[in-house]
């Protein structure tokens, strides 16, 4: 068991990956937490991707304004978030037994990105 960490308020982001039958490993990111289904603001890439491509995916989001420090809030560390997106893409691309990864929410703060909950579903080809 790992000790819980105190985290500052930030922006909740979803980072996920799946094995699509047509495209293979895919990674996605978007506004997370309870807002994922409400706003449907996600960006997808075929995995694996590097941090620069992950950052481009993040910058496509309508929610980028929240991550950049909307209404006086501190901007999120988008580079740290891009590292998380790239890592999830690598995980799905490298492990065929993984059919789905859902990291939601990832809390993006000015000091980094912290996964608060995650689910890995096995079921692909081993």
What spans do the regions from the language model cover?
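ATP-dependent carboxylate/acyl-activation modules
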Residues: 1-126
């Amino acid at each position: 068991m790992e000790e819980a960490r105190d985290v500052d308020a930030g922006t909740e982001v979803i980072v996920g990956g799946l094995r699509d039958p047509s495209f293979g490993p895919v990674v996605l990111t978007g506004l997370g937490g309870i807002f994922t289904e409400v706003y449907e603001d996600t960006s997808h890439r075929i995995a694996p991707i590097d941090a620069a491509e992950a950052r481009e995916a993040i910058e496509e989001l309508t929610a980028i304004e929240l991550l950049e420090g909307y209404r006086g809030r501190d901007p999120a560390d988008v580079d740290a978030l891009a590292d998380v997106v790239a890592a999830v893409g690598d995980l799905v691309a490298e492990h065929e037994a993984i059919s789905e990864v859902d990291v939601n929410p990832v809390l993006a703060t000015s000091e980094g990105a912290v996964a608060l909950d995650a689910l890995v579903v096995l079921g692909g080809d081993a």
